[in-house]
Amino acid sequence: MIQIDALPAFNDNYIWLLQDATSRRCAVVDPGDAKPVEAWLAAHPDWRLSDILVTHHHHDHVGGVAALKELTGARVLGPANEKIPARDLALEDGERVEVLGLVFEIFHVPGHTLGHIAYYHPAETPLLFCGDTLFAAGCGRLFEGTPAQMHHSLARLAALPANTRVYCTHEYTLSNLRFALAVEPDNAALRERFEEATRLRERDRITLPSEISLELSTNPFLRVSEKSVKKKADQRSGQQNRTPEEVFAVLRAWKDQF
């Protein structure tokens, strides 16, 4: 049984910590800062960091990789088509890799960056570590990719089993939900989610992980084929958007300025 906890970093990052109590081995996802991981290891001296999983090359996701590799000798996994510090295993779409006894499938999900990958573990309760591609009620900015690429990447993730747990890497949920409410003010599920997320953050509690089912009902970037979302995008752009990709592009540009 793998336990998953979040180690906060910077202002709003989460470094996901996977723990196998049987072997006393652990793994981390996107350690942008080594210090939170080093502190956890110091508090748990009988545990060993065996793997470091990286989704993309941005500094707030890889800044701690080299130091942790030097400290622990952990294996570093990352996208083949990006420059990842101290990488041991370069991963491409469709490959499978075993971490702490779990087999993860690699998805290439370009958009936020061109080489971005996600790690998916199919199980009774599937796990998805998706970096800055899919957020709770949102998606990543398009620093390198196109709207069409990101739309395709999100559609791929949206097709995963509804109970898939979504481990993204930023506490952006409330700001994303405010935008989602601007897009769909009459979405009852969205209003309920906003109220719940507000209660959690007022108690300084994490709003993650999410689930694919929740994203399908409340994330505007996964709802670009819904009439209510298309109508709002048409109003925003002043023209008829004929494809889901066009609707997505309007929403992403709007969110960038929201």
Curated annotation (Swiss-Prot):
Named cofactor requirement(s)? Zn(2+)
Q: Whom does it interact with, and what assembly results?
A: Monomer.
Q: In which pathway does it act?
A: Secondary metabolite metabolism; methylglyoxal degradation; (R)-lactate from methylglyoxal: step 2/2
Catalytic activity, as annotated = an S-(2-hydroxyacyl)glutathione + H2O = a 2-hydroxy carboxylate + glutathione + H(+)
The gene from which this protein is expressed is: gloB
**Positions that bind Zn(2+) 1:** H56, H58, H112, D132
This entry's Enzyme Commission designation comes to 3.1.2.6
InterPro entries xref list: Clx_II_MBL, Glyoxalase_II_hydrolase, HAGH_C, Hydroxyacylglutathione_Hdrlase, Metallo-B-lactamas, RibonucZ/Hydroxyglut_hydro
Purpose of the protein? Thiolesterase that catalyzes the hydrolysis of S-D-lactoyl-glutathione to form glutathione and D-lactic acid.
Binding positions for Zn(2+) 2?
D60, H61, D132, H170
What GO molecular function terms would the record report?
Answer: hydroxyacylglutathione hydrolase activity; metal ion binding
Its lineage reads: Bacteria, Pseudomonadati, Pseudomonadota, Gammaproteobacteria, Pseudomonadales
What NCBIfam families does the record point to? GSH_gloB (TIGR03413)
Q: Which protein, by its recorded name, is this?
A: Hydroxyacylglutathione hydrolase
Query: What does the entry's cofactor note say about binding and number?
Result: Binds 2 Zn(2+) ions per subunit.
Q: What class of enzyme is it?
A: hydrolase
Can the keyword Nucleotide-binding be found in this entry's annotation?
no
Question: Which keywords describe this protein according to UniProt?
Answer: Hydrolase, Metal-binding, Zinc
Q: Which family does it belong to?
A: Belongs to the metallo-beta-lactamase superfamily. Glyoxalase II family.
One GO-annotated biological process of the protein: methylglyoxal catabolic process to D-lactate via S-lactoyl-glutathione
